[in-house]
Amino acid sequence: MTPSRRGALSLTGAALTAGLAGCVTSSSGSGSETASGDGSGSDGSGGGSTADGGETYEVGHGDFQTTVSASAFPEKLFVYAVQTGWSNWGALMTEFEKTYGVPLNDDQRSSGEALSDLRANSQDPTHSAYNGGYTFGILAMNDGLTQAYKPADWDKVPEKLKTDNGHMTATRRMTTTVTYRKDIYEEEGIEPPETWEDLKREEIASKTQYQPPNAAVGLAGALSINNAYGGSLDDVQPVIDYYNEVKEKGAVFAGNVEQKFTKGEVHTFVEYDYTGLDLKYNADSIAEDKVATTLLTGPNGEKGAFNQPYGYGMLKGAPNPEACKLFMDYVLSLEGQRKFLDAFVRPIRAPELEMPEQFPPQSAYEETEFQVDYGKLVDEQESIISEIGKGVGLTGY
């Protein structure tokens, strides 16, 4: 996350007062120095102790509780799609390395790219865990590419957003929104969008960017539009028709929109609430008052904001399982969950944390947000992505 020019968010309340509870014991010198913490795993890793010249940590939940040793940690930990510039992973990566001495590889991939790569390397895994869109992870599990591990605080995750076998666990959720350049809209006399139909107007469509559906964020956007026009998981023709109409008016389908947005080359984009809010309140590259984020309905009030879960799972036969388990525990701890919230990513443990006041009002989410049958989506996801891509004439489908 880019350091905010406006200072830290005003997150208050008892749930936010605790620091890292991980208890780290130094093995250097004649004595040992232990950081304070209850070792419960609710706000960091379990307590550490010294063994064979290195710290050890208690990790895992229930039957998966075990001890890992720093002596087994790698020089660098590889986890798919843990990357700077997305979901505030940069802050989590920095804090994890600072606390445990393990840097993470900056893995700049989408969920779809991660799934393709781990499938290609299934016989000789290069990464320790999959991270990304939850349903993409379920596909990896169904392919037999994951293994069981329930991180500490696994019991705090809603039942519908984790698998009983411990192969996939949700860590955060994001909702499809539209972000636009408020200043450009005002200068050009463009009325801000209220429904997805408004994004068809040529003055908006000609400078709008959508993510392709093979990325989790792009699939979420496609499902949002599809639902807004009466589609379903069994019928994606509405979004195909929509995309073809805006494409003819100049809309583009690509990733990495932020730089083009700040330069004004694109004045509207479809991603998540996190993307727009983090850009508005945390980025130094553009003034806060130039950015606006909104949730849209369909033309007749249909819900048009898909709520997308993201999560992770260990990979079968993956290298460095000890460090991976510690990292997975950290991500699900309150300390790690706060890092998501700092960038307006709603953590899976949000009920235990106070939400920043900069989020759109809850009433806006209630009017627009929807979910789907995630089991059905898993079964049909790849055919849905392919059908949309081919129907719109996007490359690579």
What do the PLM-derived regions correspond to, one by one?
Residues 82-89, 126-265:
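Extracytoplasmic ligand-binding site segments that recognize negatively charged/polar headgroups
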Residues 310-372:
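Mature extracytoplasmic/periplasmic domains
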Residues 54-133, 137-138:
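Early extracytoplasmic/lumenal segment of secretory-pathway proteins
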Residues 135-139, 268-289:
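A ligand-binding cleft/hinge motif common to bilobed small-molecule-binding domains
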Residues 1-60:
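Haloarchaeal acidic low-complexity proteome signature biased toward cell-envelope/secretome components but also
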Residues 357-397:
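Extracellular/periplasmic bilobal clamshell ligand-binding domains
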Residues 156, 240-244, 251-254, 287-316:
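Periplasmic-binding protein-like
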Residues 9, 93, 119, 137, ...:
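Non-transmembrane alpha-helical segments in soluble domains
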